Amino acid sequence: MKKILPFLLSLVLAFILWLHPLSIQAAPNITVTKEYLSDGSYYETVIETNMQARSYVRGAKKTVTYKNTDNKSIWYLSVSADFYFDGKTSRCTSSSVSAGSYTSTHKVLSKTSGRSDNSGWAKATVGTYMGGVHVTDVTRTIYIYCDKNGNVS
């Protein structure tokens, strides 16, 4: 009986882990890039990836933040997406958008998101205001992709 009990406990533990493979996840992978504009301001892009199990990426997120020449964040646009992949193909199973402004001179006028095949996308239009008067708009669309092996870009 003393030899059977550890074996049975090991068997039960293995069964529990088999039932819940999504509860075990790797640490998030984070990539940061910067795209400088001619006036010295820039877009900072951060991609966060959370791999869950061998065939699922949950909560992959791409955030583009517009920063001025003083490195101050002005506004941001994010797309979050879930992907399924199997080594032969991949597909986006959900996509959502988040956008906002860090200053009183910029306002998010519209935002939308969608998905198609192996990509998710988000689009936002941000208005610039001077003295309360609407001066100009900028529209930005960002995409997040997952390849057949689970690599997110």
Where would I find each of the regions flagged by the language model?
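N-terminal prepro-regions of secreted/extracellular proteins
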Residues: M1-K72
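Mature secreted bioactive peptide module from preproproteins
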Residues: N50-S153
